[in-house]
Amino acid sequence: MATKDLFAQPEPSRQPASPAERMAALRAELHAHAHRYYVLDEPTIPDSEYDRLFKELQDLEAAYPELLTPDSPTQRVGGKPLDQFASVRHKVPMLSIRTETDTEATGAQNFDTRVRKELGLTESNPPVEYVAELKFDGLAMSLRYEHGVLVQAATRGDGEVGEEVTQNIRTIRQIPLKLPSDAPPVLEVRGEVYMRRADFEALNDKQREKIAAGAKGEKTFVNPRNAAAGAVRQLDPAIAAQRPLSFFAYGVGEVVLEAEQANPKNPWVATHMELLQALKSWGFPVAAQTKIAHGASELIAFHQAMGQQRDSLPYDIDGVVYKVNSLALQKQMGFVSREPRWAVAHKYPAQEQLTTVLGIEVQVGRTGKLTPVAKLAPVFVGGVTVTNATLHNEDEARRKDVRVGDTVIVRRAGDVIPEVVSVLPDKRLPGAPMFTMPRQCPVCGSDAVREEGEADYRCTGGLFCGAQRKEAILHYAHRRAVEIEGLGDKLVEQLVDANVIRTLPDLYKLGLTALASLDRMAEKSANNLLKALEKSKQTTLPRFLFGLGIRHVGEATAKELARHFGNLDAIMDATQEQLLAVSDVGSIVAQSIRTFFDQPHNREVVEQLRACGVHWEEGEPAAVAPKPLSGKTFVITGTLPTLSRDEAKDKVEAAGGKVAGSVSKKTDYVVAGTEAGSKLVKAQELGIAVIDEAALMRLLASAEAE
């Protein structure tokens, strides 16, 4: 007889023919997800998706109670512990609290109404006093102290039995190892182990460094919660100690008092807030945001205030928790279905959700940057419906390996642009192709290039590309460029949006009728702009060059190019080597100039501008004096103390030297840093001069002095 692995990766849900089949499918899927979440610490869906499936099963069981089975996930808190850790049976079960699915203000109102009804209160009775707390997104923990000494730390597990992780928890410096003498002889403190956002980012930075260095088996963490859970359940405490964990206390489990303290008529604490204050006095961290709230109105105010602060907190929360403050009233209200009637978790809209990638579109920004964007099946996340999520750049898209048709986790926090967090590769369609960035701009067809050391591809058709049109016009009209007085942001927006201007030459084709038809453009203003356009036709070569918006060509470089070559045609036709002969022009700038003028679209726009009457006085090329390192060939190898290889290369080339990629008999100098390798060995074999960075700087300085 075939058996089904309940903990196998679940298949995508489908709608069965009957409630019994649907309930069986949901139980299997929830068991599998609970196993991956609680046991393996490898969740594949966001919490919100698990909650949705769980709620669907609860609703079906309420509608068909005869189909309820003892093995249903609704009849227990969580999953089983791993065999590698010793099992711990909780003296007082670590039960979960009810989640209020209504994320609006009415969620708090609903809870208060239930409490007042349970306590038999009417409108004439005063508001119920609550404690409002944060709901941390971490790992629940029970800390057992005997005679003031930490003797055991255990995870929640299934609520009845957890795992002992004492050695790992001892590494968290916020958790006291010994309590003051006034603490009870036996005290179980309940709280949350979590990781601060800054610590999480620092940890992932270290992971990325390890991966870049070739370390095997290393990976980055999806979120702080996963990182914290993985650290707590490390078998090696030394590894756990390297993970920056934190802790907040929010309650107690078993408490055994001294004989003189155990007075039913005069309890050691009468309220939940008194309990938290006692924990704080014994050295446990308690969240500063915890406060007393009277009635539904103050619960609503707390929920709204924390929602506004949520993204600025140094740690993740996914909601707030309300608890009846009086311990006597808590006892009176009791539990239902293993959940306390006197507490509720009031969540915020989920910041992560599952959805499907319908396509990947490459968008072009105002400055020519190409950004891959995932087009998504609409999903409600972070309080809004999301249909697009940035993939940032080619490296990031490939690292996450996002493909069309993939099921992905998308995240949106606050006003942050939605992004794809991770992919569920087991749900990938067969044959889905990998994403690759286009080598031509999707808007204008010009070459898209990625410069060395940069993450982004950029369109090289700056003068022609529709996506860059507004930015190109504004830059051209800048007072330090060609200068067109009166042509500002708002007017450019109007002209481009109305399709009056498509390229720069269209500026000089504007007439009074077209301008006067624009909103808030009086005839006088239109005439003034036309005069400014006519005036701008007479400019200088440096201003015109700067106005073209060539990447890396600022005002100073434009002046040097004009001085060196004397005329625009010579600059447009200059080779890489000829450009490198210009003062302060290195390989990156030279390549950028060459790439710009290699695009036929850009040359066409330049010729059209000249045909419209834009002109300047051209001169003779400057006499080219030999540079101090002309004729010298350098090879740079290893890591230099202060300069990157590109910086060292630029300095050598600016002084007239040539930088080669390999050592030969024609090499004059090898500039060697640490870990120089085979190039240094070959230089020594050939008897070529080997210098360090300091010697290179002295050589450059002496060459300049000559």
From Swiss-Prot:
InterPro entries: BRCT_dom, BRCT_dom_sf, DisA/LigA_HHH, DNA_ligase, DNA_ligase_AS, DNA_ligase_CS, DNAligase_adenylation, DNAligase_N
BRCT domain span: 624-706
Keywords tagged on the record: DNA damage, DNA repair, DNA replication, Ligase, Magnesium, Manganese, Metal-binding, NAD, Zinc
Cofactor(s) listed in the protein's UniProt record: Mg(2+); Mn(2+)
Positions with a binding annotation for Zn(2+): C441, C444, C459, C465
Active site: K135
Keyword Manganese: yes
PROSITE patterns tied to this protein: BRCT (PS50172), DNA_LIGASE_N1 (PS01055), DNA_LIGASE_N2 (PS01056)
Catalysed reactions, semicolon-separated: NAD(+) + (deoxyribonucleotide)n-3'-hydroxyl + 5'-phospho-(deoxyribonucleotide)m = (deoxyribonucleotide)n+m + AMP + beta-nicotinamide D-nucleotide
Keyword ATP-binding attached: no
Annotated residues for binding of NAD(+): D47, S48, E49, Y50, D51, S96, I97, E133, R156, E192, K323, K347
Pfam families attached to this UniProt entry: BRCT (PF00533), DNA_ligase_aden (PF01653), DNA_ligase_OB (PF03120), DNA_ligase_ZBD (PF03119), HHH_2 (PF12826), HHH_5 (PF14520), Nlig-Ia (PF22745)
Gene Ontology terms describing biological process: DNA repair; DNA replication
SUPFAM superfamilies, alphabetized: BRCT domain, DNA ligase/mRNA capping enzyme, catalytic domain, Nucleic acid-binding proteins, RuvA domain 2-like
MF terms (GO), sorted A to Z: DNA binding; DNA ligase (NAD+) activity; metal ion binding
CDD domains attached to this UniProt entry: BRCT_DNA_ligase_like (cd17748), LIGANc (cd00114)
Function: DNA ligase that catalyzes the formation of phosphodiester linkages between 5'-phosphoryl and 3'-hydroxyl groups in double-stranded DNA using NAD as a coenzyme and as the energy source for the reaction. It is essential for DNA replication and repair of damaged DNA.
Family to which the UniProt record says this protein belongs: Belongs to the NAD-dependent DNA ligase family. LigA subfamily.
NCBIfam families, A to Z: dnlj, PRK07956.1
Protein name per Swiss-Prot or TrEMBL: DNA ligase
Organism in which the protein naturally occurs: Polaromonas sp. (strain JS666 / ATCC BAA-500)
Native organism taxonomy: Bacteria, Pseudomonadati, Pseudomonadota, Betaproteobacteria, Burkholderiales
The gene coding this protein: ligA
